[in-house]
């Protein structure tokens, strides 16, 4: 018999996967070109050519070693190159030992949380948030604490944030650019979060860690370079994934940054290397560690997403929908007219538009649109959104 904990999770299901499967069903009825599945954040553009070239070169150079075990933290030469790249781009001072290769950002976060959390420790998440955080916290028997946003900007509500920090607070997760809103945390936001956390660390006499989840760091439409959070708050960890920047989500490759400034950093580095193995990952994928090291200055054609964003955002605004301006990532967070999320999703379904409700992201009354699809699909969907706007006015 499966555990009660997992039984509860199975009952909840995954609206994203359910919408994806519904899209496949509708495509058989109406034709794939007439179904507009915006439910899943699966990168559409191809990986850079250098990814393929690197795979071929690396396999030919050492066909035996590339499939072998290595240091739990990953290949030393790879970690050294990543540290140097970060230092060059963000003015940091990382070394090889500060980088632990991981099975994507999710693997990095889980290894860090396993190393840091005791039963009933509290983890703060900023609404709306990636729903996987709920599972990660549950994995390590923690308690999720939700922080409200400013509904106009989707920056954190600082009063709510500070009021909910307790003696049991161990971690604060931030995600910028944000999934599902596309909002980017400003430098002022980062500074204010850091000030509050420093104050609360002194008040409670123990560390509170800031865990920055950064799979969308390169997906920015405003031309700005995002603040690198380790420069603002000492007890900051960074979980990074190459899934979006290189369009390789299925390869599950990323890393965790543990700066020297983190309290007892050397002990934490040892702990995360251990928990990586205890979770069952052993080490990050061998081949793709080497591949990403060759592609640190490469990016997929991320400008493609801006073209989709611009067309769809303008259309939705023209139709009178209330939309969060997406500054990054590849999502649009749209407010359900009248706040009726259920009716909005149902009417969208009638138009063969598949979305994910905001309640799945901890924020009722909205829906997420993933615009990481072909540009042709975006253009074909505009008439369907016109129909949806008409239905919502009835």
Predicted segments with their positions:
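PLP-dependent enzyme catalytic core of the Aspartate aminotransferase-like
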Residues: 84, 88, 162-163, 170, ...
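Conserved core of the PLP fold type I
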Residues: 63-205, 217-232, 378
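Conserved core segment of the aminotransferase class I/II
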Residues: 231-306, 389
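N-terminal small-domain helix-loop-helix segment of the aminotransferase-like
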Residues: 2-104, 111, 157, 295-298, ...
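Alpha-helix termini
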Residues: 25-31, 89-91, 196-208, 260-266, ...
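Short beta-strand
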Residues: 35-37, 239, 322-327, 359-360
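Conserved glycine-rich beta-strand-loop-beta hairpin in the small C-terminal domain of fold type I
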Residues: 286-293, 305-317, 323-335, 365
């Amino acid at each position: 018999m499966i555990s009660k904990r997992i039984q509860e999770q199975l009952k909840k299901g995954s609206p994203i996967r359910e919408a994806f499967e519904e899209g496949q069903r509708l495509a058989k009825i109406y034709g794939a070109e007439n179904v507009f599945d915006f439910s899943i954040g699966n990168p559409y553009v191809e990986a850079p050519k250098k990814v393929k070239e690197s795979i071929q070169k690396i396999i030919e150079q050492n066909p035996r070693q590339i499939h072998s075990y290595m240091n739990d933290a990953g290949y030393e030469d790879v970690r050294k190159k990543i540290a140097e790249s970060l230092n060059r781009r963000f003015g940091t001072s990382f070394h090889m030992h500060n980088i632990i290769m991981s099975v994507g950002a999710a693997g990095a976060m889980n290894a860090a949380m396993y190393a840091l959390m005791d039963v009933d420790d509290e983890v703060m998440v900023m609404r709306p948030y990636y729903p996987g955080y709920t599972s990660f916290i549950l994995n390590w028997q923690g308690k999720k604490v939700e922080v409200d946003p400013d509904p106009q900007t989707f920056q954190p509500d600082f009063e709510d944030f500070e009021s909910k920090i307790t003696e049991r607070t161990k971690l604060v997760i931030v995600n910028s650019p944000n999934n599902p809103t596309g909002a980017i945390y400003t430098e002022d936001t980062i500074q204010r979060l850091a000030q509050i956390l420093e104050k609360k660390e002194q008040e409670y006499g123990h560390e509170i860690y800031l865990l920055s989840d950064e799979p969308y760091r390169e997906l920015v439409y405003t031309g700005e370079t995002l603040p690198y959070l380790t420069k603002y708050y000492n007890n900051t960890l960074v979980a990074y994934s190459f899934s979006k920047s290189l369009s390789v989500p299925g390869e599950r490759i990323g890393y965790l940054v543990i700066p020297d400034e983190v309290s007892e950093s050397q002990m934490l580095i040892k702990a995360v290397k251990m928990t990586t193995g205890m979770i069952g990952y052993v080490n990050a994928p061998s081949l793709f560690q080497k591949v990403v090291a060759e592609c640190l200055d490469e990016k997929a054609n991320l400008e493609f997403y801006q073209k989709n964003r611009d067309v769809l955002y303008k259309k939705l605004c023209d139709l009178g929908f209330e939309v969060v301006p997406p500054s990054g990532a590849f999502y649009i967070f749209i407010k359900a007219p009248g706040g009726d999320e259920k009716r909005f999703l149902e009417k969208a379904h009638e138009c063969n538009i598949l979305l994910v409700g905001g309640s799945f992201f901890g924020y009722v009354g909205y829906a997420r649109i993933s615009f990481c699809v072909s540009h042709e699909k975006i253009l074909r969907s505009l008439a369907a959104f016109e129909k949806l706007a008409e239905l919502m006015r009835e």
